[in-house]
UniProtKB/Swiss-Prot annotation:
UniProt cross-references to Pfam families, sorted A to Z: ADI
Hydrolase among keywords: yes
The keyword Glycoprotein is annotated on this UniProt entry: yes
Pathway membership, UniProt: Amino-acid degradation; L-arginine degradation via ADI pathway; carbamoyl phosphate from L-arginine: step 1/2
One MF term in the entry's GO annotations: arginine deiminase activity
The species this protein was found in: Streptococcus pyogenes serotype M5 (strain Manfredo)
Protein name, UniProt field: Arginine deiminase
GO cellular component, as recorded: cytoplasm
Catalyzed chemical reaction(s): L-arginine + H2O = L-citrulline + NH4(+)
Subunit details: Homodimer.
GO terms of biological process kind: arginine catabolic process to ornithine; arginine deiminase pathway
InterPro entries: Arg_deiminase (IPR003876)
Length: 411
């Protein structure tokens, strides 16, 4: 990394030097059973324990010499002038789907009254309950205020924010500022916009943009993997469509970030396998975790760029051989989540046994709960850093989902 290129990520396994996290906050306490599906959750984590688990995760990374950054801090540091701060509030409000002018005015006054920038950022993440606002006179209520009177939020919370992998993705020296699958999560990308536009270190055009949040097609960071300085992998999944991938790849090739080929993985479109990194991650030069349930239906396309056109070929044959050929290694070992046991594979994939964070070649952060997969990884010679995640996992994400590398050593 240099002052001119503050992002440097050319692999999934190079020694991790700097990483972005988000400590779960009050947005988790704004989850409630009636609206879990709307907010993309299956259960409600206990915030106090989730924070303890997340703090232990962050400390485990620091113990390995990794600098830990926080989304909420960088976003606060990006509000460098009163004008930018006010613009952020107005843009946040414009995307918050607020019902009624009087409600919007009251929320704006609430946010403008918060003096501390980090407190402001954390409030926007937490959402706004209607009970926090002054009573709106009946004469000022619109039809939507009356019809939706039982819905408790004036602005929905953003409980998925601790999965920092998805709203944007670092690729080489650039960043893909994503347009996300759901309205609930798409608001999260606003923080990345302000960081990469206004932050003293990461803003001001220092980081090339290879995708923009204003695109109409969807892509998420869990489907964007940097296999090497030459090869990317992208997932065509529940959350990422093929049209977005084509736009992303054209931009990456045009910006000359160094990549020569992309492997596009098409697999089952469902919540269980919402992103490529929930079923497939790189853990060493020649080793990957994979969920066995995707192997039968998996289709892989090689994409290159020449004469200002994408060239796409569907690959046939063995996945391990394809990966070995593209990574320049003799052979690749695909390590199956849960081993050969169908029940263990399903259970441990649901608990993110395949969603590993590699912090150096062969050194991997995992949830301790996935005992069968972990034992297999250790039998392959991998060093595991095991973290507790009984509350964190309720959001359906593991160590890779909860982290966004900003700097890795080259391999």
């Amino acid at each position: 990394m240099t002052a001119q290129t503050p992002i440097h990520v050319y692999s999934e396994i190079g020694k991790l030097k700097k990483v972005l996290l988000h400590r779960p906050g009050k947005e988790i306490e704004n989850l409630m059973p009636d609206y879990l599906e709307r907010l993309l959750f299956d259960d409600i984590p206990f915030l106090e324990d989730a924070q303890k688990e997340h703090d232990a995760f962050a400390q485990a990374l620091r113990d390995e010499g990794i600098e830990v950054l926080y989304l909420e801090t960088l976003a606060a540091e990006s509000l460098v002038t009163p004008e930018i701060r006010e613009a952020f509030i107005d843009e946040y409000l414009s995307e918050a789907n607020i019902r009624g002018r009087a409600t919007k005015k009251a929320i704006r006054e609430l946010l403008m009254a918060i003096e501390d920038n980090q407190e402001l950022i954390e409030k926007t993440m937490a959402g706004v309950q209607k009970s926090e606002l002054p009573e709106i006179p009946a004469s000022e209520k619109g039809l939507t205020d009356l019809v939706e009177s039982n819905y408790p939020f004036a602005i929905d919370p953003m409980p998925n924010l601790y999965f920092t992998r998805d709203p944007f993705a670092t690729i080489g020296t650039g960043v893909s500022l994503n347009h996300m699958f759901s309205e609930t999560r798409n608001r999260e990308t606003l923080y990345g916009k302000y960081i990469f536009t206004h932050h003293p270190i990461y803003g001001g055009g220092k980081v090339p943009m290879v995708y923009d949040r204003n695109e109409t097609t969807r892509i998420e960071g869990g489907d964007e993997l940097v296999l090497s300085k030459d090869v990317l992998a992208v997932g065509i999944s529940q959350r990422t469509d093929a049209a977005s991938i084509e736009k992303l790849l054209v931009n990456i090739f045009k910006q000359n970030l160094g990549f020569k080929k992309v492997l596009a993985f098409e697999f089952a479109n469902n919540r269980k396998f919402m992103h490529l990194d929930t079923v497939f991650t790189m853990v060493d030069y020649d080793k990957f975790t994979i969920h066995p349930e995707i192997e039968g239906d998996l289709r892989v396309y090689s994409v290159t760029y020449d004469n200002e056109e994408l060239h796409i070929i569907e690959e046939k044959g063995d996945l391990a051989e394809l990966l070995a050929a593209n990574l320049g290694v003799e052979k690749v070992d695909l390590i199956r989540c849960g081993g050969d046991n169908l029940v263990a594979a399903g259970r441990e994939q649901w608990n993110d046994g395949s969603n590993t964070l590699t912090i150096a070649p062969g050194v991997v952060v995992v949830y301790n709960r996935n005992t069968i997969t972990n034992a297999i990884l250790e039998s392959k010679g991998l060093k595991l850093i095991k973290i507790h995640g009984s509350e964190l996992v309720r959001g359906r994400g593991g160590p890779r989902c909860m982290s966004m590398p900003f700097e890795r050593e080259d391999i």
